């Protein structure tokens, strides 16, 4: 080990001063680059989202989820780079010549769009998206859907969950293709669809008081119901 360094229990310490009698107080523990990146990410998320009610303890609890942290760590450099560009352009806008101002405004709007989109990505990656298992939904319907009003309400909730997921993906897809070329945002996000979702219809069958009820819900939230006599 080089002079001025010593190791104990798998940790590496560096001596702060080569003068005087060495004691434990003269050393600092070295951290790996991964630890520093994780600390930087935690600080960034805490400073950015604490006003929304996402606190440091909430962020730290996600550190055990390696895939979530890996995604967030991959997005952070892109966010910082775009934020720096946005700050510089915003500062230059008031003093730049008129023949430059229009082009600068376009670039500024691009940066704002990227930052807004990444805010959504960070937040949804951090807190997770709400979802409901189809089996659980069917159990709820069979247990509680004693009338058409309840059936309609539950189906609308499920439809809204699906629409929210599609809108989140569409938000990324609708970014200007130039932004994608500049940032590689799509590659940084796994499982992002690149086509607008087609209209889907889901049907759930519930029997209540001798009646057979079929309820269909489109992604637009339109309810279609048919009744028939149970066999």
UniProtKB/Swiss-Prot annotation:
Query: Record's superkingdom?
Result: Viruses
Q: Does the keyword Nuclease apply?
A: no
Q: What is its main location?
A: virion
A single GO CC term for this protein reads: viral tegument
UniProt keyword terms in alphabetical order: Host cytoplasm, Host Golgi apparatus, Lipoprotein, Palmitate, Phosphoprotein, Virion, Virion tegument
Record localization: Virion tegument; Host cytoplasm; Host Golgi apparatus
Question: Record's InterPro entries?
Answer: Herpes_U44 (IPR007619)
Per the record, the coiled-coil ranges are none
* PTM description: Phosphorylated. Palmitoylation is necessary for Golgi localization.
Lipid-conjugated positions (S-palmitoyl cysteine)? 12
Role according to the record: Plays several roles during the time course of infection, including egress of virus particles from the perinuclear space and secondary envelopment of cytoplasmic capsids that bud into specific trans-Golgi network (TGN)-derived membranes.
Q: Which family does it belong to?
A: Belongs to the herpesviridae UL51 family.
How does it associate, per the subunit comment? Oligomerizes. Interacts with U75; this interaction mediates U75 incorporation to virions.
Name assigned to this protein: Tegument protein UL51 homolog
Organism of origin? Human herpesvirus 6B (strain Z29)
């Amino acid at each position: 080990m080089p002079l001025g360094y010593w190791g104990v229990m798998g940790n590496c310490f560096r001596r702060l001063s080569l003068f005087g009698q060495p004691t434990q107080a003269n050393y600092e523990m070295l951290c790996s680059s991964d630890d520093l990146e994780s600390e930087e990410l935690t600080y960034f998320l805490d400073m950015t989202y604490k006003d929304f009610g996402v606190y440091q303890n909430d962020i730290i609890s996600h550190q055990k989820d390696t895939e979530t942290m890996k995604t967030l760590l991959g997005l952070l450099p892109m966010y910082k780079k775009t934020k720096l560009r946005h700050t510089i352009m915003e500062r230059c806008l008031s003093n730049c010549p008129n023949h430059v101002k229009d082009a600068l405004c376009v670039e500024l709007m691009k940066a704002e769009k990227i930052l807004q989109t990444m805010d959504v990505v960070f937040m949804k990656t951090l807190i997770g998206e709400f979802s409901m298992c189809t089996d659980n939904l069917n159990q709820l319907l069979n247990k509680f859907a004693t009338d058409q009003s309840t059936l309609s309400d539950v189906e609308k909730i499920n439809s809204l969950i699906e629409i929210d997921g599609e809108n989140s993906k569409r938000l990324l897809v609708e970014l200007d293709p130039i932004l994608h070329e500049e940032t590689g945002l799509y590659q940084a996000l796994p499982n992002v669809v690149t086509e607008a979702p087609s209209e889907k219809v889901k049907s759930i069958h519930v029997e209540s008081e001798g009646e057979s009820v079929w309820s269909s819900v489109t992604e637009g939230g339109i309810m279609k119901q048919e009744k028939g006599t149970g066999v």
